[in-house]
């Protein structure tokens, strides 16, 4: 696709069921280490739980524990550090008000929190 002039944009969601911090970071590193991937742009969406979804039912049944704001930040900081400069980070969280989510990151300005709290570790 790149040979035809297309830009490649990936979406990456840390915190999905059956993952943990190490697995999320290793998976993201593979996106840039493997020459079959290497996106030009990326959007990071920490897993959020919305009412009426299977994930919501799993959470209510105690079968899934979503990551909270701090856990999401702890996963995204090393991921951001590893993201090459050529790759544009387009988004760090969905622009959906937190009142529509049942669990997960509790801030609408999550990217700002990462920049302020972890600024020495993140490229802006």
Q: What is each of the regions a protein language model found here?
A:
Residues 94-123:
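Terminal amphipathic helices with adjacent charged low-complexity linkers/tails
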């Amino acid at each position: 696709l790149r040979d035809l002039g297309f830009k490649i944009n990936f979406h990456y969601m840390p915190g999905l069921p059956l993952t943990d911090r190490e697995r999320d970071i290793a998976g993201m590193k593979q996106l840039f280490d493997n020459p079959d991937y290497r996106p030009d742009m990326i959007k990071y969406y920490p897993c959020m739980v919305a009412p009426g979804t299977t994930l919501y039912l799993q959470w209510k049944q105690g079968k899934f524990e979503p990551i909270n704001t701090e856990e999401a930040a702890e996963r995204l900081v090393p991921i951001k550090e590893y993201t090459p400069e050529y790759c544009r980070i387009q988004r760090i969280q969905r622009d959906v008000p937190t009142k529509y989510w049942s669990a997960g990151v509790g801030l609408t300005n999550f990217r700002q929190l990462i920049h302020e709290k972890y600024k020495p570790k993140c490229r802006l």
